[in-house]
Regions:
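Carbohydrate-binding/catalytic loop surfaces
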Residues: 20-42, 85-108, 151-176, 219-246, ...
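Active-site/pore-lining binding-face segments in mid-to-C-terminal subdomains
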Residues: 169-235
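Well-ordered alpha-helical scaffold segments within catalytic/enzyme domains
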Residues: 49-67, 113-129, 181-196, 243-260
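Long, low-complexity, intrinsically disordered segments
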Residues: 304-310
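Long, well-ordered core segments of solenoidal/helical folds
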Residues: 4-41, 66-89, 129-156, 197-223, ...
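A structural/positional concept
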Residues: 38-63, 71, 86-125
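Long, contiguous hydrophobic alpha-helical segments, chiefly transmembrane helices and signal peptides
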Residues: 107-116, 138, 142, 151-165, ...
């Protein structure tokens, strides 16, 4: 428990502290609305409602404390969603508001992806009924976005799925590499689980889009651009570790389904890892273990090992 308290203090932005009957509340970024003049706004962050780190520690230690946190997490996720089909973000991001005039509620693809995986990977172990359904529902949502217009075409049948789906506004948003990879990985997992070709077809459309524009995504310093806009321009600094974790997961999934994509993914893994090494930004435990799993440990970035991706 002492180690958990120390870890929570060191990673205070990614650990829950204030639990309520409505779910965990955390200090919100000042780029969210509503926000009081003091800047001391508190709310529910969907990525923190699910207790990923507690799940890892429970699997390692089988500690009752972490088990309780996970049960609590499933209850909070159910209460948050209520009778809706998906988990909707309930606060406005001024970043999205300034770019696209999007206000809450909206669907964040990364949030729903991570929640679907939380249910899929651990729900059955905790007695959650139909624990695979969030995976199916979210994969179906991704497949439907081309028909709804929430995509960025590349060529032929290749495209990226937009990051955000507004509930009220009718606008197409950008597609960031981490969201693109996360969505593709969900589709591949859904294909493996349910053997429905529509999931594989959508995943191929995304992977071939990345292959077509690989050179545009990779920056001169080896890093990857954060996102592509509906106008096809590339902007923004990428996350330090998160996208590399996603690339490794993509490699693992395509390895068993269609290995023809592996050279492309290895090139992107090598480029991103080289950038991290040059900047001495280190790596996460997921990156280290993932590279070992796919036999590419030679790309492990230089620097310190970290628990949480930056």
């Amino acid at each position: 428990m002492e180690n958990w308290l120390l870890e929570s203090a060191q990673n205070y932005k990614k650990r829950n502290k204030w639990y309520t009957a409505s779910g965990p509340f955390n200090k919100m970024a000042t780029t969210t609305e509503p926000m009081p003049e003091t800047g001391q706004g508190y709310g529910r962050n969907l990525l923190l409602v699910k207790e990923d780190r507690a799940l890892v520690l429970y699997n390692q230690q089988k500690d009752r404390y972490f088990e309780n946190l996970i049960y609590n997490s499933f209850v909070n996720l159910k209460n948050f969603k209520e009778d809706k089909t998906y988990w909707e973000t309930e606060v406005t991001s001024t970043y999205l508001k300034d770019l696209y005039e999007i206000t809450a509620p909206f669907i964040d693809t990364r949030f729903n992806e991570q929640i679907a995986l939380f249910y899929y990977n651990s729900g059955a172990d905790f007695g959650i009924e139909n624990a695979k359904e969030p995976l199916r529902n979210y994969a179906d949502l991704l497949v439907s976005q081309k028909e709804k217009g929430n995509f960025i075409p590349v060529n032929g049948g290749s495209y990226y799925i937009s990051d955000y789906f507004p509930i009220v506004q009718d606008v197409k948003t950008h597609a960031s590499m981490n969201h693109v990879l996360g969505g593709m990985n969900i589709l591949l997992i859904a294909y493996n689980e349910f053997q429905d070709e529509k999931y594989l077809d959508a995943a191929r459309a995304i992977q071939t889009a990345i292959a077509t524009e690989k050179q545009d995504w990779i920056r001169d310093n080896g890093d990857i651009w954060y996102r592509i806009s509906p106008l096809h321009d590339y902007k923004g600094d990428d996350y330090k570790h998160l996208t590399l974790e996603d690339l490794i997961n993509s490699y693992k999934l395509w390895q068993d389904i269609d290995p023809t994509y592996l050279p492309l993914l290895e090139e992107m893994i090598a480029s991103k890892a080289s950038y991290l090494s040059n900047e001495n930004l280190g790596y996460t435990t997921k990156i280290k273990n993932g590279l070992q799993d796919i036999g590419l440990s030679q790309y492990l970035p230089k620097g310190k090992e970290q628990t949480d991706a930056l």
